[in-house]
Amino acid sequence: MELQMWKEILTPYDLAVEELKVKFNHIVKEYQQMNGYSPIEQVLGRVKSISSIIDKAQKKGIDMDKIETQLEDIAGIRLICQFTEDIYTVAGLIRERSDMQVKSEKDYITHRKKSGYRSYHIIVLYKVETLSLIHISE
């Protein structure tokens, strides 16, 4: 795939990450104004590098023309919480939002991986409005 094609594919993901970082940082500010404490301590986001996308697609046997529909973590938002209970509060907030739709959830806190890894993963569908409307998974 040419570099220009990659830019066209990844631009909506960049936009989604930036929009979601703004939205979640606003939630942090709202909580802090209401009671001085936010269940979200930090908001981070990223779009996978082209080489990481290619590597993951090859490992999973995904054709390059299907990466947008079959690779669910091209973009990601990481919400860091200070306390475990806060994670479930934040998961509830995400479920209640009308601007994103939960596609799947994996609770690696209750169901810890053998390696000891603990986290809570939520894959959401988020509508990005560009000149041509695009739906992406975050």
How should each PLM-predicted stretch be described?
Residues 86, 129-131:
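Short beta-strands and strand-coil junctions in structured, solvent-facing domains, enriched
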Residues 96-102:
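A common structural junction motif
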Residues 103-126:
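Short Gly/Thr-rich strand-loop-strand
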Residues 134-138:
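Conserved small/polar residues in nucleotide/adenosyl-binding loops
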Residues 71-73, 114-118, 133:
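A short, structural micro-pattern
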Residues 72-89:
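Short, well-structured hydrophobic secondary-structure segments
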Residues 1-70:
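Charge-rich, low-complexity segments
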Residues 89-93, 133:
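A short secondary-structure junction signal
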